[in-house]
A protein has these predicted regions:
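Catalytic nucleophile-loop/oxyanion-hole region of alpha/beta-hydrolase
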Residues: 66-91
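Short beta-strand element of the alpha/beta-hydrolase
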Residues: 25-33
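Conserved alpha/beta-hydrolase
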Residues: 43, 47-69
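Short beta-strand immediately N-terminal to the catalytic nucleophile in serine-hydrolase-like folds
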Residues: 99-101, 126
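Gly/Ala-rich beta-loop-alpha elbow adjacent to hydrolase catalytic centers
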Residues: 101-109
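N-terminal cap/lid segment of alpha/beta-hydrolase-fold proteins
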Residues: 1-23
């Protein structure tokens, strides 16, 4: 089982993460999906793989996810991307790394190329969902759903047994973080 720790981002915000560091080793950085956490099979499978192959490992829970502080409704792609870059700078430092992004984590991963393009040596998207807020949600919302989101600032999207709080600020921020149909500069 993973040993979780917390990294203090600010006086009021802490991010839960797993980090396992092998001296002189490159990193595997795992980023989970929308409203997910580090309790699932994927992060633990990649941690196990990293340990077996003596690769350093980092995975984190964005604010409002899992046991990290904050409320989900206050988060967005920009905020979660920034939190990710803070932890990469803290733990990976100047070492090379491979990014693994699951669902929304792939979108957060692609945003990391803007900062770490010389350090990133590989990228794996699992069920990659960049720009899903616009393409898979907003464009598929009915007129009534859009009106409620605009009026209330939030829409409780029911999907199966789950309910997802989709805020207007989350949708708008997603539009500021477009990565599809754009060139990604990497080594």
């Amino acid at each position: 089982m993973a040993n979780f720790r917390f990294h203090q981002i600010s006086n009021t915000q802490k991010i839960r993460h797993i980090s396992k560091i092998f001296k002189n080793s490159s990193f595997i950085v795992f980023l989970h999906g929308f409203m997910s956490d580090l309790e699932g099979k994927k992060p633990n499978a990649f941690l196990k793989f990293a340990k077996k192959n003596k690769k350093s490992f980092l995975a984190l829970e964005y604010s409002g996810h899992g046991k990290s502080s904050g409320k989900f409704v206050n988060g967005n792609i920009s905020k979660w991307s920034k939190e990710t870059s803070i932890l990469i700078k803290k733990y990976v430092k100047k070492k090379e790394f491979i990014l693994i992004g699951s669902s929304m984590g792939a979108w957060i991963s692609l945003n990391q190329f803007k900062i770490f393009k010389k350090q990133i040596k590989g990228f794996l998207g699992i069920g990659a969902a960049p720009e899903f807020l616009e393409n898979l949600m907003w464009k598929k919302f009915t007129k009534k759903m859009k009106e409620e989101t605009i009026r209330k600032g939030i829409y409780q999207l029911k999907h199966g047994n789950y309910e997802y709080p989709i805020t207007l600020q989350l949708i708008k921020d997603g539009r500021k973080n477009k990565v599809l149909n754009k060139k990604i500069n990497s080594n």
